[in-house]
Design a protein with these regions (language model features):
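Non-heme Fe(II)/2-oxoglutarate
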Residues: 1-84
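Catalytic core of non-heme Fe(II) oxygenases with the double-stranded beta-helix
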Residues: 76-187
């Protein structure tokens, strides 16, 4: 199937695509419901120099990743856009609430050929709640802000500096993102 990006941006020759057709609302709501009983741990860090500011996450097994239809659709979309095969080497779900401190970071080395997939899985999101993912160039200018609409998927080169902003004070729902870290399949 052909998936069409709603937004397509290049930041310093690295791609970023945003899709509204890779994850269904029903799928996102199902994942969200499962999170209510998940064992989140506050052990995730953005960068080594920010390790005193940990945030909540729950890791997924390779088997759990493979059972998610959105994972397979994301892999297919990347294959269609890049003509290359990728696979997940890590999957997890981030949890952020008002007052959490989240830091800018990259997900891979500048010369690595890796992608990150972010799936926004809150069943509803109000624009006033904040929670956008911001993407930066090497001058620390924000080039693109991805609104965390329910079931939205952002796929981007892992070397793009980015940050997920925590929700604003009026938001009482956690900002959940399902993340897949992808590496190129070697033959």
């Amino acid at each position: 199937m052909e998936y069409t990006p709603k937004h397509q941006v290049t930041i310093e020759n690295r791609p970023l695509w945003v899709f509204d057709d890779l994850c269904t609302q029903v799928e996102a709501e199902g994942i969200f419901k499962g999170l209510q009983v998940s064992a989140f741990k506050k052990d995730e860090i953005a960068r080594p120099d920010t390790q005193e500011y940990r945030h909540w996450a729950v890791n997924l097994s390779a088997e759990q990743i493979r059972t998610l239809p959105v994972y397979h659709r994301a892999i297919e979309a990347i294959r269609n856009l890049t003509n290359q095969e990728y696979t997940a080497y890590r999957g997890y779900i981030n949890h952020a609430s008002y007052g959490d401190m989240l830091f800018t970071h990259t997900d891979c080395a500048p010369d690595a050929n890796e992608f990150t997939v972010l799936v926004y899985i809150a069943p509803e999101w109000n624009i006033e709640w904040g929670g956008e993912t911001l993407f930066y160039n090497s001058d620390d200018d924000c080039i693109f802000a991805c609104t965390p609409k329910p079931a939205r998927v952002a796929i981007f080169h892992g070397a793009i500096k980015h940050v997920g902003r925590p929700p604003n004070r009026i938001c009482f729902t956690p900002r959940y993102t399902l993340a897949f870290k992808l590496e190129k399949v070697t033959q």
